[in-house]
Amino acid sequence: PVDTPNIKLTTEPDAELNDSETTESLTHAETGSADTSATAVSTFQAGGLSLEPAKGDWASESLQQQVEVANNATDLQGQHDGLVSVINHCYKMRKQADYCQYGAALQLTYLELYRSLHQQHVAQKNTDDIKAPAFMQLSTLLNDVGQFDEALKVCQQALEYQLTDGTVTGFEGRIKRIEKAKAKA
């Protein structure tokens, strides 16, 4: 079994927030996600990320360090960069099922964190500064673990943010490829 983070975001009702911090409450039931395989807790709130450590023989020291860096980040940009690093590492190691599962399970945490970061950048009128390779990587990880609908949602979300994945066909082409893979499954 893989120790994967549950994508459950919690709210601290007494926390004071400034413009660069946010708290949200999001659960699998609220998002309609059918994936219930992720059981460990991961939170994103004003105090920072709380990703479940990657445990087991499969988890490299590098991944464990990246999870720790992400958890220790105190601002949205640092949390985003740390989480992107974890997702990128899982993406690179996706031929190993444990990495693929762990990375795919970060989907909702990443989408919520990106939404908050995007809102912050919109308020500061500098959305061009956000780099978001994790949308492409998450869609691939989700596709690889057979969560085709979730992979499609990630691509559609990227299109809503007007992001590109660096390929000729973009997220539109990626959506078509995921739909083909879904039809074959």
What are these regions (language model features)?
Residues 1-80, 98:
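Long, contiguous interaction/recruitment modules in multidomain scaffold/adaptor proteins
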Residues 32, 47-48, 56, 78, ...:
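Residue-identity detector for glycine
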Residues 60-62, 75, 95-99, 124, ...:
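Short, structured coil/loop segments at alpha-helix boundaries
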Residues 121-136, 166-185:
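TPR/TPR-like alpha-solenoid helical repeat scaffolds
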Residues 141-150, 154-167, 175, 179:
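Amphipathic alpha-helical binding modules
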